[in-house]
A protein has these predicted regions:
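Phosphate/pyrophosphate-binding loops at sites that engage ATP/ADP/AMP, CoA/4′-phosphopantetheine
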Residues: 26-31, 141-154
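Active-site-adjacent loop and "lid" segments of alpha/beta metabolic enzymes
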Residues: 5-21, 40-58, 62, 67, ...
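Catalytic domains of carbohydrate-active enzymes, especially glycoside hydrolases
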Residues: 20-36
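Conserved functional loop/turn residues at catalytic and ligand-binding sites
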Residues: 29, 34, 88, 149, ...
Length: 248
């Protein structure tokens, strides 16, 4: 529901288009619909809490009214998250992992009982031992959640592909995402159409489906079971095929 998304900004920023797109994604296999009112791409434009609420709440309400589907709200702002929960969202996707955004977000999650996708992110790209540092920094986010009263059953972790990582680091964290799974929480992998795919294949954002599917299958093989994608049908079918092979 914003116009400056790196991939599909502006395509679904009215209610009718959002509902039609939701219907299509559910038909294609989606189990969670992610709603966002402010882009988190590099160089994104900040908007006020009130504007963000005005963008996301009507969409959440309409989706919950018209479809039997879980809704995730992509926001790091507590006031927006609170409005989203009241509107019916089931999960908060905090791109700052309770650490660098608004620190009372974990309190809200604990109080309301919604799920929380806790993403790895940081202000400066500095690491001593990259993969272990990401794992340990996600542990810190989990500790913040626990101190606020968030239960383990509410927590999903996200390695944060494309956030506070260079090209090689993005490849490494996809390769070693199983290390994050060792923390004992479900892991969401979000690679869809991201620059690591564009740089690898030398393709623009509109031609990254094949690369996205490859990362989805790789993540599935390593144990991920939640994937944030734009092209639902293609990724869902690839997952189903890969899962059959893995279980054969």
């Amino acid at each position: 529901m914003y116009t400056d998304s790196f991939s599909d900004g502006g395509k679904f920023n009215n209610l009718d288009a959002a509902l039609k797109h939701t219907e299509e994604m559910i038909k294609d296999g989606a189990k969670i619909i992610d709603v966002g009112g402010e882009s988190t791409r590099p160089g994104y434009t900040l908007i006020s809490d009130e504007e963000e609420i005005g963008r996301v709440v009507p969409v959440i309400e309409a989706i919950k009214k018209n479809f039997d589907i879980a809704v995730s709200l992509d926001t790091y702002k507590t006031k927006v998250a609170e409005a989203g929960v009241k509107a019916g969202c089931d999960m908060i996707n905090d791109v700052w992992g309770f650490k660098y955004g608004e620190r009372d977000m974990a309190d809200l999650v604990a109080k309301t009982g919604v799920a929380a996708c806790v993403m790895h992110n940081k202000n400066v790209i500095t690491y001593n031992d990259f993969v272990n540092d990401v794992v340990n920094e996600l542990k810190e986010s989990v500790e913040i959640a626990h101190k606020a009263g968030v239960k383990d059953s509410q927590i999903v972790l996200d390695p944060g592909v494309g956030f506070a990582k260079d090209y090689e680091q993005n490849l490494l964290i996809i390769k070693h995402v199983d290390k994050i799974l060792e923390l004992g929480y479900p892991v969401l992998l979000g690679t869809s159409r991201k620059s690591v795919i564009g740089l690898t294949l030398d393709v623009d954002k509109n031609d990254r489906m094949a690369g996205t599917v490859a990362t989805t299958v790789m993540g599935l093989e390593r144990g991920c079971r939640i994937f944030r994608v734009h092209d639902v049908k293609e990724n869902y079918q690839a997952m189903m095929m890969a899962e059959k092979i893995l279980k054969a």
